[in-house]
């Protein structure tokens, strides 16, 4: 009798490897503004602006991971999503603490357009996490976890600057996500959906960092 368990093709990169490769090209680490914040001595207003924007997008509950868990479009992803949701609850609290510490949003031209853009990002994330296509939300969450390593570097820099003690990183480590996605992305259809979800998440992050870069330029802080 044929097995009902999808076999894993070990001759090609795993689904997590695909997510990581996409992130190397389109993720936060590839964006000049994110790397500028990490590698230089950024203006305090630029750090504050980044914290406020990230809290606006990811500081709300339920968030993208919670929505994906509730939807459960790919049942096999639920244990991994539960772990990710638990870890991200800590990140959400950290964002709230940082937002209070950095003070008011820096005065920047075009604030109304910024608010509309951030609302657009939140809406896009809701669509991804609520997708009924098995693997789409999985890919989006995987990309978020991969990209959050760099995002967390920015947050930790802000924490140091503003006198906040950063909590331990509690999101699933790369090897755990890689193992989960090896099974979740074993079929061609699921793999395509994971890739699509990751691509869309990175596109939203790229737009977010570009928005922050444009705001820094408008303030004369670049």
Task: Enumerate the language-model features and the residues they cover.
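Terminal targeting/low-complexity segments that flank the catalytic cores of oxidoreductases
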Residues: 1-75, 146-222
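Active-site-proximal alpha-helical scaffolds that flank and shape metal-associated catalytic sites
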Residues: 76-173
